[in-house]
């Protein structure tokens, strides 16, 4: 039976020496943050009575390697980190690990002749009682790039040998488009062979907060607005330093990992990084529709659409639709808005890219004081809306909302927009919310404005939520106490 895992909660291991991490010397005392559901999924595969072929994939930096290393830490296993090298070099490296794991073939050969004999020999790896032959191949797409026949070869070996043995073979990769097209699609030789599929997502805000455990809830939310749920980014911040100090020292300073991160990833993922940089800067500056993006980047709409599709494939961009959009309407793509999904990319293209020249000469304090600090809360407004929507999803799972929500998201039309909306199946029951990431309390006019907006949504039952960074006015608190349809949620409550 195919086991597809769609994680609701996620996090990753917590290592401040991440950049120098050595897979062969895993520290068992290292703190590991979250990923509870993902680990349980992998453990269920491991303890299954049947052979397992598991595909783990997700964007770069999301924590795949750390999850798999943590999962395998107390088990006999082979963890092969595929190098970007020639086929022969890759095969030699894999042979070495197989022989070190006890393959009897080591007595007769110094290296496997080909991938067929190497993969087939997994069956002969010795195991202890109660364990299974666990082989993890990280960055599997690197191997396929050197030998395109590998998926067909594994398919044949799986069908005729591996699927009847005590094997758990894990194929892991960061090239999401490649994994989905070349391994999981119907055209792939491996289609239908995977017994488990784990698409790893960025961690939710409540797990990301564990990277800065001593921060106030407001600073945890601000950190998430800057770095998002990508563990490699979060681990760069020093939890004993303030948010502004971390921004200056860990993002704005030349030579740091985050300073050059977007440039590195764009060159890793795309052949034309300059074009993609231009598109992302246009979206970050407010261009959210295809024609607007095409005009700002001086691209033909058809060409711009292709670039945008590629950015969506690597989870840097998304096309967002109103929460009540019908499937047919969404497929026609008439009202969709392009948004940068990665919080750090949004921060980088909004603040770093336009100021690179001055940062290159070391004007860190000036750029922060005049270009970033005055606009930081404005930039955090959209990520804060996502935090509030995720809080609603979690509360929905906890059954604490007035009704069971079927859809949760943002809503807009040509005249107005609502930050977060939850609807039931019939869309007759609504929960609408306003999210304010600002330094003054929310007062009654904000509520009245929200109530007026709901007139565009024809529902028979309406509930109102107000999310505040800095609390609520006394008058609004009194009103909410007397009206059960109004709920006030502070930033502190978001982190409870």
Describe every region a protein language model picked out.
Residues 1-365:
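Phosphate-binding site recognition
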């Amino acid at each position: 039976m195919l086991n597809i895992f769609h994680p609701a909660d996620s996090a990753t291991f917590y290592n401040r020496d991440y950049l120098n991490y050595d897979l062969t010397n895993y520290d068992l005392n290292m703190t590991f943050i979250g990923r509870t559901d993902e680990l349980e999924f992998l453990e269920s595969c491991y303890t299954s009575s049947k052979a397992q072929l598991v595909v783990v994939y997700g964007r770069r930096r999301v924590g795949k390697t750390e999850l798999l290393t943590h999962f395998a830490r107390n088990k006999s296993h082979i963890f092969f980190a595929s190098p970007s090298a020639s086929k022969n070099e890759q095969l030699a490296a894999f042979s070495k690990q197989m022989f070190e794991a006890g393959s009897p073939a080591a007595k007769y050969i110094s290296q496997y002749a080909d991938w067929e004999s190497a993969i087939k020999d997994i069956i002969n790896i010795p195991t202890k009682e109660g364990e299974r032959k666990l082989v993890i191949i990280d960055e599997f797409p690197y191997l396929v790039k050197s030998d395109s026949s590998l998926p067909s070869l594994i398919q044949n070996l799986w069908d005729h040998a591996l699927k009847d043995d005590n094997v758990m073979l894990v194929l892991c990769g960061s090239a999401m488009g490649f994994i989905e097209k070349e391994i999981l699609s119907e055209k792939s030789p491996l289609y239908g062979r995977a017994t488990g599929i784990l698409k790893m997502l960025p961690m939710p805000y409540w797990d990301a907060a564990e990277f800065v455990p001593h921060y106030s809830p407001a600073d945890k939310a601000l950190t998430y607005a800057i770095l998002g749920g990508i563990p490699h980014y979060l681990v760069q911040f020093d939890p004993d330093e303030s948010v502004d100090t971390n921004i200056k020292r860990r993002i704005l300073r030349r030579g740091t990992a985050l300073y050059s991160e977007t440039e590195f990833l764009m060159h890793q993922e795309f052949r034309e990084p300059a074009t993609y940089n231009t598109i992302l800067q246009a979206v970050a500056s407010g261009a959210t529709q295809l024609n607007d993006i095409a005009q700002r980047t001086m691209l033909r709409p058809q060409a711009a659409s292709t670039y945008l599709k590629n950015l969506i494939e690597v989870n840097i961009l998304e096309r967002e639709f109103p929460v009540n959009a019908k499937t047919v309407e969404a497929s026609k793509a008439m009202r969709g808005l392009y948004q940068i999904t990665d919080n750090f990319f949004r921060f980088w293209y909004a603040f770093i890219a336009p100021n690179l020249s001055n940062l290159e000469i070391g004007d860190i304090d000036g750029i922060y004081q005049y270009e970033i600090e005055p606009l930081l809360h404005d930039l955090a407004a959209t990520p804060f809306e996502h935090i509030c929507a995720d809080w609603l999803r979690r509360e929905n799972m906890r059954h604490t909302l007035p009704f069971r929500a079927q859809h949760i998201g943002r809503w807009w039309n040509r005249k107005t927009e609502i930050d977060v909306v939850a609807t039931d199946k019939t869309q007759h029951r609504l929960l609408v919310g306003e999210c304010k990431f600002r330094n003054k309390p929310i007062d009654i006019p904000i509520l009245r404005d929200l109530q007026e907006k709901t007139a565009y949504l024809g529902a028979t039952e309406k509930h109102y939520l107000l999310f505040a960074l800095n609390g609520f006015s006394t008058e609004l608190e009194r009103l909410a106490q007397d009206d059960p349809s109004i709920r006030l949620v502070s930033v502190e409550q978001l982190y409870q």
